[in-house]
Amino acid sequence: MEIISVIVIGGLVLVAIVATLYMVPLRLWIAAQASGAGVSMLTLIAMRLRRVPPDQIVNARISAVKAGLEEVSVDMLEAHYLARGRVEAVVNALISAGKAGMELDFSRAAAIDLAGRNVLEAVAMSVNPRVIETPKVSAVAKDGIQLLAIARVTVRANIDRLVGGAGEQTVLARVGEGVVSTIGSADDYKHVLENPDTISKNVLKKGLDAGTAFEILSIDIADVDVGSNIGAKLQTEQAEADKQVAQAKAESRRALAVAQEQEMKAKTQEMRAKLVEAESTIPLAVAEALRTGKLGVMDYYNMRNVIADTEMRQGIAGTTGGKPDPAGES
């Protein structure tokens, strides 16, 4: 029984030692004390209980102290970690800003980091400006010639406007808009080719970095190419459209004329039918006149001679408009 008791006590002591070593990272505590970071044993145990990795917080605190950032406390680092921030990136950004002589405190750096910005990259861009290139921008001068331009924009991160400021895409879009506006206001495309710096000057005057997280230092036109003659194409397309409209109107007038012609032909046939109908009553009228004595025989033959003479004259003139003898049908 005594042996079993000794084994149980030894096991409990071993478990207690392992738990103590887990709860109290001696290596980190020793490193913090050696570097003057001033992290107590209770603080390390509290980090374990709050599920905060002590090594990340302690290493960041040691880096800050060694860089002279004594104001960055363990509580500030731990609070930033619990807010899902990147502690190491914030501390490295503070160190870089301090070495570069920039004014950047922990609260602002933490706010930039929590806003989703890369605070370390922002500090690096503030020290070393970066060049971003626009895609090929197409614009048309007043003479109708298309120009394709590529601009290189040198920007520097503005720490004060990183939170809530627009990003690179906004800067590129504004620069492209300025390039299009400048080329579009040029009377001659040759003037733009001869003086590409006019584009840079006009674009810089517009203050395109307002409301963005960057400060535009310079805009340089890297390349300008001549595209197609857009003005001529538009005129050609307009002429073709006018031609089609004119053809449509002419076709409409032709169809209207054909319809009117057919209508007149129908009316002519109708009048001829009425004429034939009227002429069919002439023999009956002549017979009735002869029977009643209102028309003499000599008068009838005189009328026949006139009709025959008229038909002969029309035949000689080439106009066969003569009608058959209406009296002969009776």
Curated annotation (Swiss-Prot):
InterPro entries: FloA (IPR022853), SerRS_1_N_sf (IPR042103), tRNA-bd_arm (IPR010978)
Location within or outside the cell: Cell membrane; Membrane raft
GO cellular component: membrane raft; plasma membrane
TM spans (from-to): 3-23, 26-46
Presence of keyword Membrane: yes
Gene3D superfamilies attached to this UniProt entry: Serine-tRNA synthetase, tRNA binding domain (1.10.287.40)
UniProt keyword 4Fe-4S, yes or no: no
Superkingdom classification of source: Bacteria
GO MF, any single term: nucleotide binding
Annotated coiled-coil segments of the chain: none
Keywords of the record: Cell membrane, Membrane, Transmembrane, Transmembrane helix
Membrane topology type: Multi-pass membrane protein
Similarity comment: family membership: Belongs to the flotillin-like FloA family.
Function of the molecule: Found in functional membrane microdomains (FMM) that may be equivalent to eukaryotic membrane rafts. FMMs are highly dynamic and increase in number as cells age. Flotillins are thought to be important factors in membrane fluidity.
NCBIfam families assigned to the protein according to its UniProt record, in alphabetical order: PRK13665.1 (NF010186)
Subunit structure, as described in the record: Homooligomerizes.
Name of the protein described by the UniProt record: Flotillin-like protein FloA
